[in-house]
Curated annotation (Swiss-Prot):
Family: Belongs to the IPP transferase family.
Entry-linked Pfam families: IPPT (PF01715)
GO molecular function, one term: tRNA dimethylallyltransferase activity
Originating gene: miaA
Keywords associated with the record: ATP-binding, Magnesium, Nucleotide-binding, Transferase, tRNA processing
Region (Interaction with substrate tRNA): 49-52, 172-176
Cofactor(s) it depends on: Mg(2+)
Chain residues that bind substrate: T26, A27, S28, G29, K30, S31
Protein residues bound to ATP: G24, P25, T26, A27, S28, G29, K30, S31
Role, per record: Catalyzes the transfer of a dimethylallyl group onto the adenine at position 37 in tRNAs that read codons beginning with uridine, leading to the formation of N6-(dimethylallyl)adenosine (i(6)A).
Catalytic activity annotation: adenosine(37) in tRNA + dimethylallyl diphosphate = N(6)-dimethylallyladenosine(37) in tRNA + diphosphate
Protein name: tRNA dimethylallyltransferase
Complex formation: Monomer.
Source species: Mesorhizobium japonicum (strain LMG 29417 / CECT 9101 / MAFF 303099) (Mesorhizobium loti (strain MAFF 303099))
Superkingdom as given in the UniProt entry: Bacteria
């Protein structure tokens, strides 16, 4: 069965039918579950995690390994240079290209931990203007020179409504608002009000969010980071450092990068850097779980400790036909 519906706009023309969405905090086992599900359903896997899209960071972002990639087709993993500020809109455009190219004709399983990706997929997203490199570079330079608080003051004068919705220290969103205003002459709020169409057919889609036991998750996080070190995480950090990238880029903020860089520079001991990275991972997982708990709607099935995983899998496969 085709993954694209062609029965008319009212029925969701051009949207992916029978999509399966799997969300969960980092280290919750969602990638393994998605792989099993994709094999059973004869489907493909689409990365829905903002960090796993970056190249170089194979190990530190826990991307699927070669053996898993060989089992079913995987898309949107490691395809973005770490020097790029990859956005939700860019990810959605990449998904649209997969659809246009017929790559999602088999049942797609979207899996990841980036809640905004799932929201954009199911609800649509505002189309933002393209930002010319000269404008992007200008505002990155201004951020370095002036700092977030001063740029927030500038935004307050130029676009007070947008500025009032942002914390003065939220450098990434402040710069984004200034870039959009500079490139288009319109407030980012105006662009955000123009929401696009969803890319999936919600009526046939199936939604699953993993809610793991907290203690078990902490244990998995601890063990997984140790395994990352054994698999070459330090070499990835060296490769990333060799690129000489802006430290404010999203890829440079991947968990473990700054701590391990500090240890390699002699600013921290390696045990201290490792412990900091593990703590940051636990905190990130907690934020993800909180977001999923409060932001995902009733259509999302919750997979909790003690639930029958096999029954859940069978239901998802049976319903997605």
């Amino acid at each position: 069965m085709s993954g694209i519906e062609n029965s008319g706009a009212d029925a969701g023309e051009g949207r992916v039918k029978n999509a399966i969405l799997i969300a969960g905090p980092t280290a919750s086992g969602k990638s393994a579950l998605a792989l099993d599900l994709a094999e059973r359903a004869g489907g493909v896997i689409v990365n829905s995690d903002s960090m796993q899209g970056y190249s170089v960071l194979d190990v530190l972002t826990a991307r699927p390994e070669a053996a898993d990639l060989a089992r079913v087709p995987h898309f949107l993993y490691g395809h973005v240079h770490p020097g790029t500020a990859y956005s939700t809109g860019a990810w959605l455009r990449d998904v649209m290209k997969l659809i246009d190219d017929g790559m999602l004709s088999r049942r797609p399983v979207f899996v990841g931990g980036t809640g905004l990706y799932f929201r954009a997929l199911a609800e649509g997203i505002s189309e933002m203007p393209d930002i010319p490199p000269r404008i992007r570079d200008r505002w990155r330079y201004e951020l370095k020179e002036q700092g977030a608080v001063k740029l927030h003051g500038l935004l307050l004068r130029e676009d007070s409504r947008a500025a009032m919705q942002l914390k003065p220290t939220d450098s990434q969103r402040i710069v984004r608002a200034l870039e959009v205003l500079d490139a288009s002459g319109r407030s980012i709020l105006e662009w955000q009000a123009e929401r696009g169409r969803p890319l999936i057919d919600r009526q046939t889609a199936r939604f699953l969010v993993i809610e793991p036991d907290r203690a078990a998750l902490v244990d998995r996080i601890e063990r997984r980071f140790d395994q990352m070190l054994d698999k070459g995480a330090l070499e990835e950090v060296r490769q990333l450092a060799a690129l000489g990238l802006d430290p404010d880029l999203p890829a440079m903020k991947a968990i473990g990068v700054r701590d391990l860089q500090a240890a390699m520079a002699g600013q921290l001991s390696f045990p201290e850097a490792i412990e900091r990275a593990k703590i940051a991972t636990r905190q990130y997982a907690k934020r993800q779980a909180t977001w999923f708990r409060h932001q995902l709607g009733p259509e999302w099935q919750r997979l909790r400790p003690g639930d029958d995983l096999e029954t859940t899998m069978q239901t998802l496969v049976a319903n997605a036909t």
